Amino acid sequence: MKKTLHRILYRTLPLEGYLRAVSRLFFLWQRLGLGRRAPETEYVYHLPQLVRAGDTCIDIGANLGYYARTISRLAGPAGRVYAVEPVAPIRKVLSRNLRRCGNTEILPFALGAAAGPVRMGNDSARENGYFGTGRNFVNEGGGRSDVEFTAEMRRGSELFARLPRLDFIKCDIEGYEAVVMEEMRPLLERFRPTALVETG
């Protein structure tokens, strides 16, 4: 049912309209508690056990704000949330979805082991019949992708070097998690944050 709805929306709406509709559906799904047992959304419901008021948090692969919005609410006005999202069309809708989250800053970068321009791809439309917003990947091999984006890559260890504290990291970046977490090792060792990392 959900995949069919995604396909219909993707085929009938322009990309931004599709992204806005998908995010609205997710937030409705979340408010109604319907995603508690769905593998792709269940972890957002565990955030109250992981994030506290006043925490400094980083959401790497912020996508449309599914986690960042909840993290922002939990961290509260004394907290700080950095939402990292490199893909411009997704980031535009993310900005709209986080407009009431005054403690959140959106960073327009991909994180990795180097700094500079990077090609990103997304092949989900060919595979699923719709654009999967969480299926963007760094295209290191240089092959053609169905949808391609250019982004700016930064080292997380440099981007966040001046943070006075770091309490929580969520990292979901389509197989690039190990690269980013290894590159950010100095920050992880310094602050020992709680980490929610996709692994497979």
Segments and roles (model prediction):
Residues 1-200:
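Phosphate/nucleotide-binding beta-alpha loop and adjacent structural elements of enzyme active sites
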